[in-house]
Amino acid sequence: MKVSEWMTKDVISITKDRSIQECVNLMKKHSIRHLPVVEDGKLVGLVTEGDLRQIFLASLIEDLTIKDVMISDPITVSPDTEIEDAAKVIFYNKIGGLPVVDEEDRLLGIITVADILAAFIEIMGVLKATSRIDVILGDDPEAFEKVSSLIRDRGGEIVSVGISGHRIRRKRVYYFRLKKCNVRHLAKVLERAGYQVVSSVA
């Protein structure tokens, strides 16, 4: 899944010669927290809500323009970046959004934490009418296929699977999200097969 599928394409932007107050007004008007700074269609900087909070603690803000407070070399991604990779960039850099640019730094869009969350919710099927069963598979390297087959053989349809990040394999929990079904029956089937069902949500 690519960034281009989830980014905001109609991006509100500003030029570096504008005042801080103009920037604040734009952010309030459009309810945004990240404002790309452009020059001739190319990205030259980024202003965030956090940057502005710090500036308002200083005096003489009326003498400042965007170029005085913007991030001059913001981290960016391309539209072909995988959504998972964009999520990693945001997580590791502790930032709230990424401008999306082409090879010539032309601004194409912006992708934020909210956009990425929406993508993962779609991938996981969280908002759909689903059931979930959480299972510890143990050490058997073929356990995932065996459990998946047991679920399918009993009429279950797997929507997505998540895995806990436990470093010890036998303690990892597998979160099977299924199309709405009799998950209690499936839990009993898996337990009879020797697997530990941690929880189930109908």
Predicted feature residues:
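Short basic, glycine-rich beta-strand/loop surfaces that mediate nucleic-acid
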Residues: 171-180
